[in-house]
UniProtKB/Swiss-Prot annotation:
SUPFAM superfamilies: Acyl-CoA N-acyltransferases (Nat). GO terms for cellular component: mitochondrion. InterPro entries: Acyl_CoA_acyltransferase, Glycine_N-acyltransferase, Glycine_N-acyltransferase_C, Glycine_N-acyltransferase_N. The modification N6-acetyllysine is found at residues 16, 113, 127, 142, 159, 183, 256. The gene is Glyat. The modification N6-succinyllysine is found at residues 16, 127, 142, 169, 183, 256, 267. This is Glycine N-acyltransferase.
Length: 296
């Protein structure tokens, strides 16, 4: 059975229900939070049954997914209470269009078996990335306090070192900055990723510091799942604490708006891991997962 959740009441019930399964449901919880606050990416939620669902998929409306090669748009967020038995639901073409280049995101590594099986059935090549999922300590305290182990918090205030404010000015990104963000984004560097970045800048809060030239020296922004992503610093201004300052500023903006604040970091990126620790971002017991699926 496929049940589309329509109307504010059902979607608010889903958000409340997903809260019980944090942090494993975080990727879907963050997305539904944004669907319930304006839904600028025109997403929809599908469940296998209601109200006692096992699996939920959040995805764009069909009319948004016109480009079969655009996995930045063709993105699905998945949470399942029963990852071993969700394959049939995920295999439905009404739930996931397996004919396109697509991307699946989830805080559940256990979905890998079902996704790999379905990709094999539909002749898709899969690249699975598993990264460290970080959540800001205040979000942990508010949403799932049982995981707040103060032993894991860095000593100190969690604030970054001051920057040279005569040289650098705190600001937000403009759509004209998308090309710069795209150039330094590990998952980007192409026309489709630039369109995605432009859409994020237009619709969600972002933070940057402008260098003496008046262009961004360091930045971070938010995507449609409510995650802080695409942080970067131009090479000549690295190792000056700018990205810590920018991420902390973005933290504050998101907290004021009531958003859950989270991000991910590659397991090999020790510099960002140290920075996350200093800002009191806590690593979660579950991972940040991405599956990029491309037809063979």
């Amino acid at each position: 059975m496929i049940v589309p959740l329509q109307g504010a009441q059902m979607l608010q019930m889903l958000e409340k229900s997903l809260k019980k399964y944090l942090p494993e449901s975080l990727k879907v919880y963050g997305t539904i939070y944004h669907v319930n606050h304006g839904n600028p990416f025109n997403l929809k939620a599908l469940v296998d049954k209601w109200p006692d669902f096992n699996t939920v998929v959040v995805r764009p409306q069909e009319q948004e997914m016109k480009d079969d090669l655009d996995f930045y748009t063709n993105t699905y967020q998945i949470y399942s209470k029963d990852p071993e038995n969700c394959q049939e639901f995920l295999g439905s073409s009404e739930v996931i269009n397996w004919k396109q280049h697509l991307q699946i995101q989830s805080s559940q590594s256990h979905l890998n078996k079902a996704i790999q099986n379905l990709a094999s059935i539909h002749s898709l090549q899969v690249k699975h990335s598993e990264n460290i999922l970080y959540v800001v300590s205040e979000t942990v305290r508010k949403l799932f306090p049982s995981l707040l182990d103060t032993k894991n918090l860095s000593p100190g205030s969690g604030k970054p070192k001051a920057i040279n404010q005569e040289m650098f000015k705190l600001s937000s990104l403009d759509v004209t900055h998308a090309a710069l963000v795209n150039k330094f984004w590990l998952f980007g560097g192409n026309e489709r990723s630039q369109r995605f970045i432009e859409r994020c800048i237009k619709n969600f809060p972002s933070s940057c510091v402008l260098g003496p030239e008046g262009t961004p020296a360091s930045w971070t922004l938010m995507d449609q799942t409510g995650e802080m992503r695409m942080g970067g610093t131009v090479p000549q201004y690295r190792a000056q604490g700018l990205v810590s300052f920018v991420i902390y500023s973005q933290d504050q903006i998101m907290k004021k708006r009531g958003f859950p604040v989270y991000s991910h970091t590659d397991k090999s990126n020790t510099v960002m891991q140290k920075m996350s620790y200093s800002l009191q971002h806590l690593p979660m017991p579950c991972a940040w997962n991405q599956w990029i699926c491309v037809p063979m």
